[in-house]
């Protein structure tokens, strides 16, 4: 920055390179990653990555476990049962995973619909000329012409979600200092 107080960032090749390979990048391309935006790794000149495609609240599915998927009288999540009847943390955690899967499927469907709209309404021909394989495939970056194509939603509230799951496991199921009824009531008033 102009003030000289830059914001250093540290990136870990031991994590990023395998993660990019998991997304389909060759080892050679993964080793030549660059950071775009804030923290998103990709291979320049070969990737169409829609980064920050969506922001996903990791705590919302947890909230839905306590209400059996209801929000103000409307069924917005899946029915995972009465939280006060869940006898083990594993049962509670399974309900959380079901809520997560449901809300992630909604996010993926929405992102896919937006990808289609981008391809139809905003093909980006100039950019496509500079990204490998678009010309060879006869497709814009928005139509899947790049060597690598992926969308990157961001999960937020991860620390709050992890802390909450830990507190529920510890206080309700292990130490039994709080009943699930008390936990549910406390959350309703929060």
Q: How would you describe each model-predicted region?
A:
Residues 1-190:
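Conserved catalytic cores of very large enzyme subunits
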């Amino acid at each position: 920055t102009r003030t000289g107080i830059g914001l250093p960032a540290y990136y870990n090749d031991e994590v990023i390179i395998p993660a990019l390979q998991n997304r389909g990048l060759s080892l050679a391309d993964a080793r030549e990653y660059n950071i775009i935006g804030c923290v998103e790794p990709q291979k320049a000149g070969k990737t169409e990555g829609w980064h920050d495609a969506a922001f996903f609240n990791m705590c919302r599915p947890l909230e839905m476990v306590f209400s059996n998927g209801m929000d103000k009288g409307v069924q917005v999540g899946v029915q995972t049962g009465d939280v006060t009847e869940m006898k083990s943390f594993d049962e509670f955690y399974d309900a959380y995973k079901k809520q997560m899967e449901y809300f992630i499927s909604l996010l993926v469907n929405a992102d896919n619909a937006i990808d289609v709209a981008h391809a139809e309404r905003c093909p980006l021909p100039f950019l496509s000329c500079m990204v490998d394989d678009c010309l060879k495939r006869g497709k814009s970056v928005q139509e899947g012409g790049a060597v690598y194509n992926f969308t990157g939603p961001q999960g937020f509230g991860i620390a709050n979600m992890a802390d909450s799951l830990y507190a529920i496991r510890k206080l309700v199921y292990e130490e039994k200092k709080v009943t699930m009824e008390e936990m549910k009531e406390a959350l309703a008033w929060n």
